């Protein structure tokens, strides 16, 4: 990968940095930058745009930096306001942070869209300064920017989501990324007969827990990675993925990026028809905005749906003339189903 491409920070890391800066300000310190921990063990320095006070509340703002990623949220201001407490960290969403209205997402309906990992990052950053605090996360332009994201389709209203599993946004360049996949697969071929592939950070960790340090992170480029594994002479490919991406693979999509394909709920409906689910279930699922919501609405049929989608994805990917096994994991990295 081009070493000159710039990495960025997630909205979750930006919120954690703002929260730590606000916590420092509550102790009379005006920070120009803060260093915050990440789930991958790195500490990242983030510049602070400004600090200010609202009565007994202390606020700080940082600017999200997306590096060389084409991201509509690049440069957005993330604000955190802190009210010191004796103990415990309470995290809330405010202006410009979306509210979840549908089931099936990592955050339950009715709550602000601050995902579990960013919540932990915010708490850890604040606890480096204070014993306890109430933290309010705000995004002044969040409501306007949300219209340019997938949030409206996912049933998240009124703002953006605070996301990220590592805190770091890797630079995206299609050609560079494909070259990186090929290089990793080539290097590992001497050690392995089976290519171990993972689509995202959660899938990657789950695969590492089973297979160790031989996992290749492939993002959305599933077809390319499987085809390259076949060309390099691997005897098989094992793919770790999550239900949302799996649904696209089950439709025959080899690039699972949202700009390339969708139809995820349709994949769930197909599986339900194969399972002879009643019309009422089909109708309910047809109104889902995400695979997570669709599976929640599918109820007792959810396990069968995942199994059918995994087997269909396996059939499509084996068109590259290599045996493929699918491991489906949830957002905790637990294996829900495998075709092995």
Curated annotation (Swiss-Prot):
One GO biological process term: methylation
UniProt pathway: Cofactor biosynthesis; adenosylcobalamin biosynthesis; cob(II)yrinate a,c-diamide from sirohydrochlorin (anaerobic route): step 6/10
Keyword terms, alphabetized: Cobalamin biosynthesis, Methyltransferase, S-adenosyl-L-methionine, Transferase
Reactions mediated catalytically: Co-precorrin-5B + S-adenosyl-L-methionine = Co-precorrin-6A + S-adenosyl-L-homocysteine
Top-level division of the source organism's lineage: Archaea
SUPFAM superfamilies linked: CbiD-like
Gene3D superfamilies attached to this UniProt entry: CbiD-like
Enzyme class: transferase
One GO molecular-function entry: cobalt-precorrin-5B C1-methyltransferase activity
S-S bonds: none
E.C. number(s) listed in UniProt: 2.1.1.195
Family label: Belongs to the CbiD family.
Protein name in UniProt: Cobalt-precorrin-5B C(1)-methyltransferase
Source species of the chain: Pyrobaculum aerophilum (strain ATCC 51768 / DSM 7523 / JCM 9630 / CIP 104966 / NBRC 100827 / IM2)
